[in-house]
Amino acid sequence: WKKSVLAAAFVALFSNVLLNLNFYPTIWMAYDTASSKSQFLTEQLLGMVANGILMFFILAASFITAESLTRRAFPKHIQIWKTWTSNVANSKRVLNDTIFAYLIVPIKLALIGAFYILMERNFGFWSPASSSFDPNYLASIFPWYTGLAISLQAGFWEEMLFRAVPIAAGVLIGQRYNMRFTGLMVAMVIQALIFGAGHANYPAQPSYARVVELFLPSIVVYGMIYLRLGVVFGAITHYVYDVVLFSLPIWYSSGYMFDKFMTVIGGLIPLLVILYFRMKHQKWSDVDSSSLNEGFVPTPPEEKTAEEPEVVSTVPSASNVLNPKIIGIALIFVIGIFSTFKLSNVEVPVNSPSIDKEKAISIANQFLSDNNITLPDGYNAYAFDDSSCLLYTSPSPRDVRSS
């Protein structure tokens, strides 16, 4: 479970905290000018951290459950966290399975394209083009990073949660009652429905369009890859597929050559890992049984010998009462509070009107009378402060209008 937790921490940091920081230029669109800049930034940063921590726990629970169930249900699969390790990543089996995962991507794109052409023309399905990609990705600090980060979490988390957990659980439940195949078929249908419903928040008509769209790929693409190869290779297909879609704003835009290059490099990471281990060992290796799920050996817990606790009497002193860590945290807290007040715009100049509403309306009516202007019946006078209008280039009396 420790490797699952480490993987969850990496994805939570890479695809949540750093991704939100990457959109730093756009967070100012939600800036409330009634609060200080430091307060706004503090709220945003705390929100990013809180979201990352929450996502970490969700990812960790999903990864631990998926790894455990897969290990029990499919003993011939390569252990999830050994796929990209020495003497496994540089094997021809991993290379062939990875290439196969890449080759599925254009097939999946063709299936989705054909689905919408058929359903929109013959069955009235509708999906707005604006939901395909978000042009705001180009406003981020590193546009290439956005697609990679989103695809990493979507690819690996969704395959763990929507594929590995239900299918492996269905197999184990069916196996418990000597109905392994029946349990597998039921789990296949259930995971396809859940996967489609989980993506039904995109605007589309009818409301179940995404469920219908993803039902078949969930079974014949991702489901079969998981059964035959393992969850890692299904995640690779899912990851590369999402990278292609999320990077569309970059490829449709002129320039952005560095971002296009980084997007290609990011999409090739699974192959680059294999190339790295192949160059490191200078040969292709074979996957032995110890790297398969059936060869998994749990790490035995360390036995701790009971030791008599030593009673140490400490006398309070400045060295142990004023702990340096406590002092450091307190200083950071004080500096942060001071900065909040220091950067806050406490004094805001306000130019209040020098006359009241009734006086303003009286002046307006007098102006109409002096200029022999008669308004049709039904017009009512009202007054408002329009001193901030950009039409005024020099100080002038309050603008009083009537309508």
Where are the regions a protein language model picked out?
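Membrane-interfacial loop-to-transmembrane alpha-helix junctions, especially the N-terminal start
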Residues: 2-11, 183-185, 231-234, 289, ...
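Transmembrane helix-loop-helix hairpins at the membrane interface
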Residues: 127-285
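Membrane-interfacial, low-structure loops and terminal tails that flank and connect transmembrane helices
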Residues: 73-96, 284-321
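Single conserved hydrophobic/aromatic residue that forms the stacking wall/gate
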Residues: 392-402
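Internal/C-terminal transmembrane anchor helices
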Residues: 319-342
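Alpha-helical transmembrane segments
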Residues: 1, 59-68, 270-283, 336-340
